[in-house]
Amino acid sequence: LLLAAMLVLSLAACGDKTGDDSKNNDGNDASNTEVSGLAEAIAEYPALVTSGGQSADYQMIATVMEKQGMEFTTNNLATSADLGDAKTLIVVVGGSSKGLGAAGIDADGELARLDELMKAAKDAGVTIIAMHTGGEARRGDLSDKFITPVFNMADYAIVVSSGDSDGMMKDLCAQNSIPMDSIDSISDVVSVLPAAFK
């Protein structure tokens, strides 16, 4: 019993410490940052799904979309030449050194590809949806390189909440007036992504 009581107290202390740290890390505005979810459908078919960092997360989103009967194509190395008749670009953010290696591209090359693709999409009036669905496992130096540039150009964002415990994506969306829906897991994508399409 004593051991159990000590464990509970140590966990409670860790919980308090984490809460204090998040307040210190977030600064003055982050704790007050409010972001609304998507109020009405903004996207149109067909969609082009690509990776932002070459993790396999984009393939999981494609599987969900296929099961929902959504009209889309996937291309993990898409450039402006691949936009075709796409009316929506979905960029699934998550860095993977293994995925980058398999694609024959480094992080800087991936950032340049995404910048070129997203600028072309913006110029063509294509709706951009940023997704971060890998949770906490898809955070860290590599993945974080891709989050800011992708979210800054997005029209809408979907985030698995465990991947945004520091509020980075929420803050980016608030700063850019981008609607963002937080979900508990990748399986919850079905409750928000199809509803984004007209």
Regions found by a protein language model. Name each.
Residues 160, 179-185:
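Short acidic-hydrophobic, aromatic-tinged amphipathic segments that line or gate anion-handling sites
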Residues 110-144, 186-198:
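Ser/Thr/Gly-rich flexible loops in soluble cytosolic domains mediating phosphotransfer, phosphorylation
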